[in-house]
């Protein structure tokens, strides 16, 4: 009689998440205890640890790396001279673990020629757009394409029916890559189609971030999917160990159907993204659907990750687009960024849009935790007369990060940037749109983790009709927002001190 409730209780208590959290917490406590016990009274060891911290600081000063990240660690080491150097060695080096880096770089090098820029794709662009496109094509490398139709979605529930319809039409393959999967209405609708298509012989593959999906999936998820002939890779699996490897997450959102249709944006496969579940009020997001030549970039992105961990294809040509739209609509350029190299591609795209803007830049971002370079770019654009508007959430999902975001408001307002908070709920979209000339829609937040630690993706639009669609979405959204004034940014002395500490440590959050 009581057996089933007892089993459910024990399953809830002794699940993977609980065990992982408890073991990691115990390791942290043990390491701290061992550190203080071992160093107590040992002058030579204290001196050695301080010397290590000094050497780490000197190394950071010379290192060619984002200044905000370096300053954050230097401050932390200054506050904790004994522990700071050791913490940096354990957690501070943002290069991925050796096995992760070697596997992915090997595949990317082999297939670099798959992403060569075809001639004549950007000839009709203005010089500013052409220069940005050339940069992404060279240092991504992700080429730009003319023969691509795009459609912008202003929320997840608008995108979802079209996504299901495209999945239903799959004949050859379906590739999905997401940060968050969570059981519920949205995932169930997708899963039913995936199971049916896999049974029909369609090649169905799924990559999901193990950390992002840790709370949302049953422990036997991979086994169940593989039995249904849906092949799975949990990216960078979470293990109950204190490890730098856990820093690097797959934050991308990608769907590719038959090489002809692709989706990306901020929408994950969980119910809040289509407002089937209310977590922080109304969930405002954005996504984009591509059809045509530019889908190839997303196909290669996915296959590179897949073949790094489950080597299968040496030739990607079988997955190339076979259907192109009849009408050309500007230029479309999907791109990805990762911590595998020292090229800050995602940040540079945002900085370039700001620096080249002449009339306006409208920005959706759920978080604002940026370095001085990005902060200066926002202020400089506003100071030269560009209409710069930032739209952020009114209801936060992370209160400390929300406090950090607000700590940037006053200097931006003083420079002339206009800031809005989306009062109906949480704004999760990540978009830039400028001058009716260029736009970016993707998974990339304006914070250090997205810009430098995570695997991310986005789509650049040049002189495309959906740039106007994004601008109109912003214009419809602004009346639902509260504009922030300087008077809203007043705080007391403890609040100012907290904001200062958060700003200093923002690269570490």
Predicted features, each with a name:
Residues 416-421:
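Flexible, glycine/threonine-enriched loop-and-boundary segments that flank and lead into catalytic domains
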